[in-house]
UniProtKB/Swiss-Prot annotation:
Subunit composition and interactions: Influenza RNA polymerase is composed of three subunits: PB1, PB2 and PA. Interacts (via N-terminus) with PA (via C-terminus). Interacts (via C-terminus) with PB2 (via N-terminus); this interaction is essential for transcription initiation.
Keywords, sorted A to Z: Eukaryotic host gene expression shutoff by virus, Eukaryotic host transcription shutoff by virus, Host cytoplasm, Host gene expression shutoff by virus, Host nucleus, Host-virus interaction, Inhibition of host RNA polymerase II by virus, Nucleotide-binding, Nucleotidyltransferase, Phosphoprotein, RNA-directed RNA polymerase, Transferase, Viral RNA replication, Viral transcription
Taxonomic path: Viruses, Riboviria, Orthornavirae, Negarnaviricota, Polyploviricotina
Name recorded for this polypeptide: RNA-directed RNA polymerase catalytic subunit
Main function: RNA-dependent RNA polymerase which is responsible for replication and transcription of virus RNA segments. The transcription of viral mRNAs occurs by a unique mechanism called cap-snatching. 5' methylated caps of cellular mRNAs are cleaved after 10-13 nucleotides by PA. In turn, these short capped RNAs are used as primers by PB1 for transcription of viral mRNAs. During virus replication, PB1 initiates RNA synthesis and copy vRNA into complementary RNA (cRNA) which in turn serves as a template for the production of more vRNAs.
Composition skew (Polar residues), residue ranges: 55-64
Superkingdom: Viruses
Gene name per UniProt: PB1
A GO-annotated cellular component: host cell nucleus
Region (Disordered): 50-82
Length: 647
């Protein structure tokens, strides 16, 4: 049965087809080369947004730092990071007033978690900047290296202790006059290969002890390594993301725990929930605004976009928020939570690998490491790069750039959401003291704003007031990229709302298909994807049945496991036919062994082996599920979780 794709759209309303215009099929773009240029862009942009702030020099590291907080009030619509501390604190106070006890309760929850969390929490996560080797490593390795070096420097760290004790070590390490580390270096030498008699380069990795003085150690502890964000669709330019080292991670974790606890209690927060729960939250806010506006009011919704959210955020604002939120709490707790923002106020951005140069005439390639950018002759660079380097030079120390303002991507998602929600919270009539009022949703830098007013002038006034209020705390709503519609049609975090949520099906398109690496995983992923889309994305029964047939077809072609009684010849068909003929109960064979497909849209939740178990020949059962079978690995069962299975 072959499918004509145009038939799928005959009865689809236009708004449901919007999702197919998303750039989601095909491979996403990946970045190549170094991220140095993108990182310099980020550093330069961040300083430009805060350029009217005050410059100071960090006494410990000698890094020049720009502080835009309580800077000039904006006179134009350009994005800026001049948050006013008193406005932030007032927004926090109003948030607490309208949610009684919220900060108090979240602090108590967090305090409990702080005392129980083990240090191995930090092994979760991907690539982490390993300050001992000055490059990225998997999180577990970076943590182990850090603990090992702390130990050899007389600190008490251990891998199974509490996270809070590890953080005490981090604090102590920053007071030390010097830290001795073991670092790796590469030796290259040219040797003649005995076999081929050609010259080859041999690399050996050696270990050496190195002493870091206080300044060098502090710079490393405060460094965020940067990389280019991969696989971003729908963008022409790549951008830089940051990964912090182990010294910062633990402190950030506790701050985010507190902020998460607060977000869970805020109806306007799109974090930390996701999926259908997030849609339900959203629908509630929309319902509330629509119900109130039915008789006399107009209701409009802005699908919002903020300009460079994290480059205009400021760690000092977060410090003020935390100081306020924890104001009645024990001293030790306040200290632990305030360290993360303080470290971010003094952070350094590592510029990455540097630039690659090649000479066409001499066929030579050479890399200029970031450390050399401070004093290399700029005549080798093209004009745009030259401008970047000139701008960033005053900020450079040892190949890292001092970056006090701004937050870098994805660091304080929860806490910045709390800040956003605190402005949405000010839209209640008792605060606006006029005819317009607003509400909305915030999820990290994404927001949807619903404004109600008796007439269009009121709506405009409400939007203007929201815009200006945001400016006061360093949030810059982009007038160019936000658009306004009658409430009932908007987009928030890639959920499209039109009198209810429209399934954004194209987001799922890449997961339909067979990867061709692992037969059993592909089978279970394939049917699960179809099941999930029936639950979440309006995939109807007829289309799902068709998707299932196409999937089985695709699967059989990928693994060449056509039914044993088929006429199709492949290089597996001889073996599969033999198995087919030897098997008494042919229905019991797995699809990957040339068996028939027993899946339909009613039994997608059952793994294939379970589905066919009763139908299998005994010796076939023994082969599939035999602990002594050398081709099937079996772990000792450590614990049993009873799955909650919905009928």
């Amino acid at each position: 049965m072959d499918v004509n794709p145009t038939l799928l759209f005959l009865k689809v309303p236009a708004q449901n087809a919007i999702s197919t215009t998303f750039p989601y099929t095909g491979d996403p773009p990946y970045s190549h080369g170094t991220g140095t240029g993108y990182t310099m862009d980020t550093v330069n942009r961040t300083h430009q947004y805060s350029e009217k702030g005050k410059w100071t020099t960090n006494t410990e590291t000698g890094a020049p730092q720009l502080n835009p907080i309580d800077g000039p009030l904006p006179e134009d619509n350009e994005p800026s990071g001049y948050a006013q501390t008193d406005c932030v604190l007032e927004a926090m106070a109003f948030l607490e007033e309208s949610h009684s006890g919220i900060f108090e309760n979240s602090c108590l929850e967090t305090m409990e978690i702080v005392q129980q969390t083990r240090v191995d929490k930090l092994t979760q996560g991907r690539q982490t900047y390993d300050w001992t080797l000055n490059r990225n490593q998997p999180a577990a390795t970076a943590l182990a290296n850090t603990i090992e070096i702390f130990r050899s420097n007389g600190l008490t760290a251990n891998e199974s202790g509490r996270l809070i004790d590890f953080l005490k070590d981090v604090m102590e390490s920053m007071d030390k006059e010097e830290m001795e580390i073991t670092t790796h270096f590469q030796r290259k030498r040219r040797v003649r290969d005995n076999m081929t008699k050609k010259m080859v380069t041999q690399r050996t990795i050696g270990k050496k002890k190195q002493r870091l003085n206080k300044k060098s150690y502090l710079i490393r502890a405060l460094t965020l390594n940067t990389m280019t964000k991969d696989a971003e669709r729908g963008k022409l330019k790549r951008r830089a993301i940051a990964t912090p080292g182990m010294q910062i991670r633990g402190f950030v974790y506790f701050v985010e725990t507190l902020a998460r606890s607060i977000c869970e209690k805020l109806e306007q927060s799109g974090l930390p929930v996701g999926g259908n729960e997030k849609k339900a939250k959203l629908a509630n806010v929309v319902r509330k605004m629509m119900t109130n506006s039915q008789d006399t009011e107009l209701s409009f919704t802005i699908t919002g976009d903020n300009t460079k959210w994290n480059e205009n955020q400021n760690p000092r604002v977060f410090l003020a928020m935390i100081t306020y939120i924890t104001r009645n709490q024990p001293e030790w707790f306040r200290n632990v939570l305030s360290i993360a923002p303080i470290m971010f106020s003094n952070k350094m951005a590592r510029l990455g690998k540097g630039y690659m140069f090649e000479s066409k005439s001499m066929k030579l390639r050479t890399q200029i490491p970031a450390e050399m950018l401070a004093n290399i002759d700029l005549k080798y660079f093209n004009e745009s790069t030259r401008k970047k380097i000139e701008k960033i030079r005053p900020l450079l120390i040892d190949g890292t750039a001092s970056l006090s303002p701004g937050m870098m991507m994805g660091m304080f998602n929860m806490l910045s959401t709390v800040l956003g929600v605190s402005i949405l919270n000010l839209g209640q009539k008792r605060y606006t003291k006029t005819t317009y009022w607003w509400d909305g949703l915030q999820s990290s830098d994404d927001f949807a704003l619903i404004v109600n007013a008796p007439n269009h002038e009121g709506i405009q006034a409400g939007v203007d007031r929201f815009y200006r209020t945001c400016k006061l705390v360093g949030i810059n709503m982009s007038k160019k990229k936000s658009y306004i519609n009658r409430t009932g049609t908007f987009e928030f975090t890639s959920f499209f709302y039109r009198y209810g949520f429209v399934a954004n099906f194209s987001m799922e398109l890449p997961s339909f298909g067979v990867s061709g690496i692992n037969e059993s995983a592909d089978m279970s992923i394939g049917v699960t994807v179809i099941k999930n889309n029936m639950i979440n994305n309006d995939l109807g029964p007829a289309t799902a049945q068709m998707a299932l047939q196409l999937f089985i077809k695709d699967y059989r072609y990928t693994y060449r496991c056509h039914r044993g009684d088929t006429q199709i010849q492949t290089r597996r068909s001889f073996e599969l036919k033999k198995l087919w003929e030897q098997t008494r109960s042919k229905a019991g064979l797995l699809v990957s062994d040339g068996g028939p497909n027993l899946y339909n849209i009613r039994n997608l939740h059952i793994p294939e082996v379970c589905l066919k178990w009763e139908l299998m020949d005994e010796d076939y059962q023994g082969r599939l599920c035999n602990p002594l079978n050398p081709f099937v690995s079996h772990k000792e069962i450590e614990s049993v979780n009873n799955a909650v299975v919905m009928p």
